[in-house]
């Protein structure tokens, strides 16, 4: 009896040892994904916003006067950029299904960097519009394309934090661009006969080029593409075949029968996902109207603030955006009953306050500074809505690519005329129409997010499944590695049952 007990104890120790080693291996894989996937997409988005916000910083730092830009020229150039962004959105996302993302995203980064360099030679407003259009074609690969990539590597509980870090990287780029322009104007203005704003575009390119090269060499693309271990990529030295296999299997099973063909369009259109997520991000994107149209920088210029102040003060909006985005991600990842729609409704309430404050006293510096900085909270919507769409559309690869791209495309399509109608540069300092527009989109986005949650619950009930289940627990897999996982996944199974019970309980009270 003693011998048998000793044998059982030894077996338990061995199991604990195996489990511990396996857990360390999982953590190591997640670390590698963060190091080589998340790092590249964040660097790409960071320089994307350095380049993009750099245009506005150049405008208020001498470009307007040097190129004799007048009236709504800034707004028109931004609209031209948005048109290019819209045109490239869906094709870029679909290209990720045909061309390895390592190649396509790196190429697009290099291409828009080269066009940014061309901006230092512009001599007219027409040159600006032409370059900005093609810049946008390539830059449109970044935002929705990255959310597609993140959804291919990360599980539901991992997505909010990574989406928030990604969003935050763009906001850091926005802040960095303002400080960099201030420094460039101070130290390089007039050097070699070039104005400070021209030097900004040159330096932007010098930063963009190494990021494109880094992506081509180290970015692994998608876990289910054999190109991830191409001879031209260092990825084969970073991820082994077993790790790539596990990276695919740790996510929920997809419907492998779906293909990118003519059946894709009716398949996507007959579901509510495409319609509702496109609508909610049209509204959520316009909640950023005051921030995305550089209204604070224009207000500072109108009120005769110094050049350094015009470049630096708007950075506070992006700082608030970073904090609010990270806080919302932590809330959704760590709080058991947290829901995406909770954050959406909170953003709606905050943006209503912003609209009321600016409309009430648009010339009071204390009110305007407070409202503009508070408006940075709307940036949290990027991580919230796109991670939500990633989760709901995960089972259909082609649908997910189209939905994520369409969200950004329709938001851009509306913003192309919305900014002219409500946030034109000649409406400074009051932006009266913009306040009413923000009030409408803030309230509407909150309502639509509640509707999406209702549809999600109804869909989960009809499928009789948990929204997101670890694929390692799916039946029909018999390799040794996964059998070993199954021995140690009892706790995970219990958690899934608990989540399922909680999901079913929500049917009677869906908005708790």
UniProtKB/Swiss-Prot annotation:
The keyword Transmembrane applies. One of its GO terms (molecular function) is pantothenate transmembrane transporter activity. The chain crosses the membrane at residues 28-48, 80-100, 103-123, 133-153, 165-185, 199-219, 272-292, 313-333, 343-363, 373-393, 402-422, 435-455. The gene is FEN2. Present with 3060 molecules/cell in log phase SD medium. Keywords: Cell membrane, Membrane, Transmembrane, Transmembrane helix, Transport. It comes from Saccharomyces cerevisiae (strain ATCC 204508 / S288c). Residues 49-79, 124-132, 186-198, 293-312, 364-372, 423-434 are extracellular. Residues 475-496 have a biased composition (Acidic residues). It holds the Pfam family MFS_1. Residues 1-27, 101-102, 154-164, 220-271, 334-342, 394-401, 456-512 are cytoplasmic. Belongs to the major facilitator superfamily. Allantoate permease family. Residues 468-512 are annotated as: Disordered. It is found in: Cell membrane. This is Pantothenate transporter FEN2. Transports pantothenate into the cell. Also involved in the catabolite repression-mediated regulation of ergosterol biosynthesis and in fenpropimorph resistance. Signal peptide: none annotated. It is a multi-pass membrane protein. GO terms for cellular component: cell periphery; fungal-type vacuole; fungal-type vacuole membrane; plasma membrane. GO terms for biological process: endocytosis; pantothenate import across plasma membrane; pantothenate transmembrane transport. Its main location: membrane.
